[in-house]
Amino acid sequence: QSLELMRMEKNRGVQVTAETAPHYFTLTEDAAAGYDTNAKMNPPLRSEADRAAVLQALVDGTIDAIATDHAPHSCLEKECEFELAANGIIGLESALPLGLTLVADDLLSPGRLVELMTANPARILGIPGGSLQPGAVADITIIRPDQSFTFSEADICSKSRNTPFLGFQMPGRAVLTMVGGEIRFEKGLRSRHHSLSTDLSRHIPGWIFPTSLPVTLHTEQAGIAVPAAQLA
């Protein structure tokens, strides 16, 4: 009902925005059937019909942004009775890979995912970022959409481990993030803190999407570079 109301108001020209988080387009209430506290969140997970409605809203533009809803908790807050456990899960490390599952399943285009996770959030909040135009802040994430992996604790940078996605097969991942033109995160690549002017084609197989910055990547290889806003 909330999505239908949002869709109706947008069709009327009302300036409203909506966001969702990856767990709402990936999981259903069945994930909490065994009282797994890592599946306890607020709002709670709903039915398969609700999940399908969220997916449709992502596809048709009713939902403007995908946010992580990152909510780290200690073991003490989660390893207890379901009723007493804290709400929320971590989402920084799993948000992009889960978004890439929608691309792999042909539900979203790479460009639409970029809008949902970078350009739209920056535009809605009125903050710099979400753009690869000349003069924009050099915040970039390099993505390998072909680098599938099984999500494990080794992929988590947060101190907290409260995620329901351990063991999930992911179709792709972020392999490098630049902030202000400096490398701040890399997965199996070079050492940190190289400048943006470095010719990355010698180090990173991939292509850049979209491109305007002085970064050279081979377009015939598999990879995407997108603004880093909301992908960290």
Task: Annotate each predicted stretch with a short phrase.
Residues L213-A232:
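Cysteine/selenocysteine-centered motifs that mediate thiol-based redox chemistry or coordinate metal-sulfur cofactors
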Residues L5-E9, L27-A32, L76-C80, E153-D155, ...:
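Short acidic, glycine/serine/threonine-rich loops at helix termini
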Residues L3-A18, H73-I90, A122-I127, R202-H218:
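Short, electropositive alpha-helical surface patch
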